[in-house]
Amino acid sequence: MKPSGLTFAFLVVFMMAIMYNSVQVTADADADAEAEALANALAEAGILMYQGLGEKSDGLDQGQNGKVVAKK
């Protein structure tokens, strides 16, 4: 039995949807990692700026992996 053109079109669209979904998941993960790195860099730059001006930065502490976290 030979598959029809409609079956072939469905398979093409289905494969395109799977490929798009896999690319989108990778892009979202990259964007999340980039946003976190930028937030950490800005927070660290803010701490360094305040320390350079002689002001206290007691509200923040550098946690594991170099991430800036609020002191408890």
Curated annotation (Swiss-Prot):
Q: Which segments does the entry list as coiled coil?
A: none
Quote the protein name from its UniProt record.
U-poneritoxin(01)-Om7a
Give residue ranges for the propeptide: 28-45
Q: Which UniProt keywords apply?
A: Secreted, Signal
Tissue expression remark: Expressed by the venom gland.
Give GO cellular component annotations, separated by semicolons: extracellular region
Subcellular location as annotated: Secreted
Q: Residue span of the signal peptide, if any? A: 1-27
> Which family, according to UniProt?
Belongs to the formicidae venom precursor-01 superfamily.
Q: What is the role of this chain?
A: Peptide with unknown function that does not resemble any other pilosulin-like peptide and appears to have a coiled coil structure.
Keyword presence, Electron transport: no
